[in-house]
Design a protein with these regions (language model features):
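Short, Lys/Arg-rich amphipathic alpha-helical interaction segments
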Residues: 442-445
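Histidine-bearing beta->alpha loop at or near hydrolase active sites
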Residues: 432-436
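Short, polar/acidic, helix-capping and beta-turn segments at strand->helix junctions
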Residues: 395
Length: 447
């Protein structure tokens, strides 16, 4: 197939049936929409081009810089598209958590600006959040930049109402699937596809998948974060369920090894979430058939992007998959029972403890967030580096008082549970994190 421009290769991705011998569903045909085969490697290629294209001529004329609040696939696609048209691109984020994507953005000539922030995406109601302030500044003055605004731009959703959704219907012979499954990041793809499918059949079931609380799966928000996304509408989904990072990796490995799909952990989360949700429905359908062949139903999930960019993510969480010894003292092994037993300290209690016993206060946030505001006397060890230290054993004396601090108290509680299991006798987590400390009017200092 011949193209005159690489952007012509965006879209029209294959819809591939997953072998039932792999997923085990007896009455439901499960299909993967291979968005990973877009030319820049992900489902975000569609939205990036649809958001950029209408304003491209004006941006070129005034030599504007393309700017997006993204640390992942949207930034990657926009960096390529901007470069194609002689424009500069700047990625603004609170934290680059996938080093391979950071390096690729730099290779593509992108400028990366990291700001302190409490979430992977901005909260327009939080006027103190630097990402929110930056977003507002971009919105108010567009003379020298083109802000594609993926979290609020309706063209994000439109890319899927005009492309992805109709392609699924066409490839299924003109009918919508019985179920559609998508991970929720900006909510653009899930909203756009669901809208089209329900126009064909209002009875289509839509499953939205989010990351489990305090977990990190690239490209997926937690339930708390997703409410901050302007395109997110809970009415789009019949049900929203959580997927863990371990489940995402397990699903990814199954797609890689059993299905020949070199998809990443986001795709693994969509696959594993789809199978888990559909299994009881499949069993009920088989039971009702009473031994007769059941009428086939269909389900589609989005295979978002490729695996190659996430080998570091796998190495940190499941090193045994890459031929390395499993990490001792891994954060992912903390149980709910251990978490429930953690000694939390509210703001008032923590202030008294600091005054009376002078515990070591360890701030687990990124360096930019720490520099912006932190508890006086706290040291900064970014959570990923802290976990690497813990892999080798207790980083402090067993009896030394330690107060762990993170944005909202979730990650610090998991670390406190892990250190307690390892034998530390006096570690606590700041309940509610820095946000609770700030909201209580407790003092914070700047670097």
């Amino acid at each position: 197939m011949r193209y005159d421009d690489i952007t012509e290769a965006i879209g029209n991705t294959p819809l591939v049936r997953i072998d039932p011998a792999v997923h085990g569903l007896r009455t439901i045909d499960l299909y993967a929409k291979l968005e990973m085969l877009n030319p820049f490697g992900s489902v975000k290629d569609r939205a990036a081009w649809n958001m950029l294209r209408p304003d491209l001529a004006g941006a070129v004329e005034r030599d504007a810089q393309v700017v997006e609040l993204s640390s992942g696939n949207t930034a990657k696609a926009l960096a390529v598209l901007a470069g194609l048209h002689g424009l500069r691109f700047r990625s603004v984020t609170n934290r680059m958590r996938v080093p391979e994507l950071r390096e690729l953005l730099l290779l593509l000539g992108a400028e990366i600006e990291e700001l302190p922030g409490r979430s992977e995406c901005l909260d327009p109601t939080d006027t103190d959040d630097p990402l929110t302030q930056f977003h507002r500044a971009l919105t108010e003055d567009g003379a020298h930049h083109l802000h594609t605004d993926q979290y609020f731009n309706p063209r994000n959703t439109e890319a899927h109402t005009t492309g992805t959704g109709p392609e699924i219907v066409k490839d299924l012979g003109g009918r919508a699937p019985d179920w559609f499954v998508a991970c929720v990041g900006t909510a653009g793809s899930s909203t756009g596809v669901a809208r089209v499918l329900r126009e064909h059949d209002p009875g289509v079931g839509v499953l939205g998948l989010v990351a489990a609380k305090s977990d990190f799966i690239p490209g997926i928000r937690t339930l708390d974060e997703v409410a901050e996304v302007g395109l997110f509408d809970p009415e789009t989904y019949d049900v929203i369920e959580a997927v863990t990072a371990d489940e995402a990796i397990d699903g990814m490995v199954e797609l890689n090894r059993r299905c020949g799909l070199l998809a990443g952990p986001t795709s693994g989360a969509a696959y594993r979430g789809a199978v888990s949700h559909l299994r009881p429905l499949d069993e009920e359908r088989a039971r009702r058939a009473s031994g007769e062949p059941a009428e086939r139903a269909t389900a589609v999930f989005i295979a978002c992007d490729r695996v190659e960019s996430y080998l570091g993510y796998v190495r940190r969480r499941r090193p045994e998959l890459l031929g390395r010894a499993p990490h001792r003292n891994a954060l992912a092994t903390v149980t709910e029972a251990e978490l429930a037993a953690v000694r939390d300290a509210g703001v008032a209690e923590a202030r008294r403890w600091i005054e009376e016993e002078r515990p070591l206060v360890v701030d687990l946030r990124g360096s930019h967030a720490y520099a912006a505001l932190h508890i006086e006397g706290a040291i900064n060890i970014v959570d990923e580096l802290f976990e690497q230290q813990v892999h080798g054993g207790l980083p402090f004396g067993r009896d030394r008082p330690v107060l762990l601090v993170c944005p909202v108290g979730e990650k610090s509680a998991r670390f406190a549970a892990l250190l307690t299991r390892m034998g530390h006798t006096n570690v606590r987590s700041l309940a509610g994190g820095v946000v609770a400390w700030r909201d209580a009017g407790a003092p914070l200092v700047r670097e």
